[in-house]
């Protein structure tokens, strides 16, 4: 393919990106530019206020536009004529297409009238926050691509991408071309490609302030549209900057990400400030008045599954999308769940219950696939037991099983407590609860200490509103939501009695017993091993004696209810605290030993936790829990 100024192609030249351009013949005679064309070009340039033959006059844009429009009719093959028309204010897609098409002649007329380098050019809108100046062939191609992308049609996106791809292949590091690639993919809602393009660019120290601001807001928005809210927020946290439109878009995106994170209070603050500054912005007004207004998310897989890569309308919805890697991922999830379940120390009955649960769901789905009658079953669960007995971890295992079997689309688990659901004002609780449930859809909502929702016993407790909202959503989203409630058995029974609809939806119970002292010692040994630590034997004996005493004693909890002291300590959670605190005691002991500063410690010394380390760690832990152990 002939490049710029290369070869002859029988009356048709091809520029460096493969676009067909008419040969410059109409305004040339025997290879020379027609003198009349040169004279008219000089007159038009003066009307733009550009120095011609080192002389200039005040600009007259109307005259320049009229003159260049007439010039393009007689010199339609001259890029400089089209560039002048764009500089005079006509940046219609036809003009920009012509400038791109005739780009191989750029500079021909300018040299005839001795224009300074880059004197003739125009600013064009990229279609997303930034404007670039076009003075040369590749600039004109980008300006045309931007105009194509601004029309918003799949065919135009494809054409624009073809134009820009030809440039980036030759000039991979040119930021202007990379930004146009971002713009095209942004407008076509190809968010994963926007992220790929911007990630290596966004922290470039050579970016000017406006470019850096635009890049961060665009990347944050793309990440949010992919449902990657935490990384999105890192780019949207400070949305202000030199690009005013980007600052508004960034603040709105930040608010909606906070809403997706179920931080409605912070989202509302951002929206209120934004609305005060921009009351004319309809999206901001809608987001402020409607708490269900949020970010529409997709996935890279769904984007790639489009029948037309540039048409968002051909993208499969979440319900219709079949991930080609889903089968392998589901099998991996089931295997992972089995391994995690097998690694648990104790909890034999819990393991059996979870295994039966898996079998029940698996066979239910098989019967459904065969067209056999399937009894309407609820998949919501009650996990009853004291703190630290593995309820949250088993909930994650159940989420993997449900997802691996295809009952749920995600293995995500959203763990919440009363404070996450309850608001301070009328209407706030319903909004917060709905937002929490929205974030848990297609996964598991894990409500720990569920009884706290109604612990006050007051008829006007907002917790009752949260329960009503939860029940309604469990019915309306029964195919997309699994709820697991957790807490002490007696407390959960009281909770289930507060609303007649709860018992019928939570029919499957799994009881989590307190660990035995021997099991807790096993847990301590395993935790230490995973951290490259080891308890000396006497330390393990002391731990078992401690756990046995705590298991035999009772202590009132914060509500005055007598509980096993070991349950108040937190069972497995208490063990983790002991391991971590004992390691700190070991480090302190070694740092104050005779070898401190020399580093002359054996691996055994660096790993061993002694009985004294344990003893010094346990006392402050028990004191912090309000517990004591009788001798």
UniProtKB/Swiss-Prot annotation:
Q: Which SMART domains does the record cross-reference, listed alphabetically?
A: AAA (SM00382)
What does this gene product do?
Part of the ESX-3 specialized secretion system, which is important for iron and zinc uptake or homeostasis. EccA3 exhibits ATPase activity and may provide energy for the export of ESX-3 substrates.
**GO molecular function terms attached to this record:** ATP binding; ATP hydrolysis activity
Pfam families on file: AAA (PF00004), AAA_lid_6 (PF17866), T7SS_EccA1_N (PF21545)
Q: What is this protein called?
A: ESX-3 secretion system protein EccA3
Sequence similarity: Belongs to the CbxX/CfxQ family.
User: What does the entry give for GO biological process?
Assistant: cellular response to iron ion starvation; intracellular iron ion homeostasis; intracellular zinc ion homeostasis; siderophore-dependent iron import into cell
What induces or represses its expression, per the UniProt entry?
Repressed by IdeR in the presence of iron and by Zur in the presence of zinc.
Q: Where in the cell is it found?
A: Cytoplasm
Q: Report keywords, A-Z.
A: ATP-binding, Cytoplasm, Nucleotide-binding
Subunit notes for this chain?
Part of the ESX-3 / type VII secretion system (T7SS), which is composed of cytosolic and membrane components.
Q: Where does ATP bind?
A: 385-392
**Top-level taxon of origin:** Bacteria
InterPro entries (alphabetical): AAA+_ATPase, AAA_lid_6, ATPase_AAA_core, CbxX/CfxQ, CbxX/CfxQ_RuBisCO_ESX, P-loop_NTPase, T7SS_EccA, T7SS_EccA1-like_N
Q: Name one GO cellular component term.
A: cytosol
């Amino acid at each position: 393919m002939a490049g710029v100024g290369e070869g002859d192609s029988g009356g048709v030249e091809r520029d460096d990106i493969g676009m067909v351009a008419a040969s410059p013949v109409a305004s040339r005679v025997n290879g020379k530019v027609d003198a009349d064309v040169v004279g008219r070009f000089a007159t038009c340039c003066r009307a733009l206020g550009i120095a011609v033959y080192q002389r200039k006059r005040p600009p007259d844009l109307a005259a320049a536009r009229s003159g260049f429009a007439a010039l393009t009719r007689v010199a339609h093959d001259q890029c400089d004529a089209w560039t002048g028309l764009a500089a005079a204010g006509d940046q219609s897609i036809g003009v920009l297409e012509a400038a791109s098409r005739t780009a191989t002649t750029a500079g021909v007329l300018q040299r005839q009238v001795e224009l300074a380098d880059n004197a003739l050019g125009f600013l064009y809108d990229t279609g997303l926050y930034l404007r670039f100046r076009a003075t040369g062939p590749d600039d004109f191609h980008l300006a045309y691509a931007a105009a194509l992308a601004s029309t918003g049609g799949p065919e135009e996106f494809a054409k624009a991408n073809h134009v820009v791809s030809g440039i980036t292949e030759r000039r991979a590091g040119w930021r202007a071309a990379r930004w146009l690639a971002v713009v095209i993919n942004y407008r076509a809602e190809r968010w994963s490609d926007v992220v790929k393009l911007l990630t290596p660019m966004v922290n470039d120290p050579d970016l000017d302030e406006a470019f850096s601001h635009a890049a961060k807001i665009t990347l944050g928005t793309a990440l949010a549209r992919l449902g990657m809210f935490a990384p999105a927020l890192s780019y949207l946290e400070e949305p202000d900057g030199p690009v005013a439109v980007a600052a508004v878009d960034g603040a709105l995106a930040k608010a909606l990400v906070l809403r997706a994170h179920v931080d409605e209070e912070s989202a509302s603050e951002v929206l209120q400030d934004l609305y005060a500054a921009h009351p004319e912005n309809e999206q901001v007004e809608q987001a402020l008045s409607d708490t269900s207004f949020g970010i529409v998310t997709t996935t890279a897989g769904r984007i790639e599954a489009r029948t037309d890569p540039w048409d968002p309308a051909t993208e499969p919805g979440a319900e219709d999308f079949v991930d080609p890697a889903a089968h392998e991922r589901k099998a991996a999830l089931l295997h992972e769940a089995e391994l995690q379940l097998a690694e648990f120390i104790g909890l034999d009955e819990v393991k059996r219950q979870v295994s039966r649960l898996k079998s029940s769901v698996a066979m239910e789905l098989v019967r459904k696939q065969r067209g056999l009658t399937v009894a309407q079953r609820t998949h919501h669960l009650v996990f009853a037991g004291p703190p630290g007995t593995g309820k949250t971890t088993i909930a994650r295992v159940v989420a993997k099983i449900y997802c691996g079997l295809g009952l749920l689309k995600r293995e995500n688990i959203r763990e919440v407590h009363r404070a996450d659901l309850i608001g301070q004002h009328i209407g706030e609780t319903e909004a917060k609860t709905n937002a929490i449930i929205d974030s848990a859809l297609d996964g598991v909502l894990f409500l720990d200490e569920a009884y706290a929702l109604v612990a006050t016993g007051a008829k006007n407790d907002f917790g009752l509103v949260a329960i009503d909202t939860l029940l309604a959503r469990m019915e309306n989203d029964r195919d997309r939501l699994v709820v697991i409630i957790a807490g002490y058995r007696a407390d959960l029974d009281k909770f289930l009695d507060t609303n007649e609809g709860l018992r019928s939806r939570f029919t499957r119970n799994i009881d989590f017993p307190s660990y035995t002292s021997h099991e807790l010692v096993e847990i301590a040994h395993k935790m230490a091993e995973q951290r490259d630590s080891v308890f000396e034997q006497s330390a393990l004996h002391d731990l078992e004696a401690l756990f046995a005493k705590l298991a035999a004693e009772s202590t009132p909890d914060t509500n005055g209810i007598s509980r096993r002291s070991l349950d108040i300590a937190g069972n497995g959670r208490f063990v983790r605290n002991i391991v971590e605190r004992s390691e700190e005691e070991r480090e302190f002991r070694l740092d104050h030993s005779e070898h401190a500063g020399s580093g002359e410690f054996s691996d055994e010394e660096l790993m061993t936790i002694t009985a004294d380390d344990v003893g010094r760690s346990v006392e402050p832990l028990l004191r912090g829990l309000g517990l004591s152990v009788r001798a």
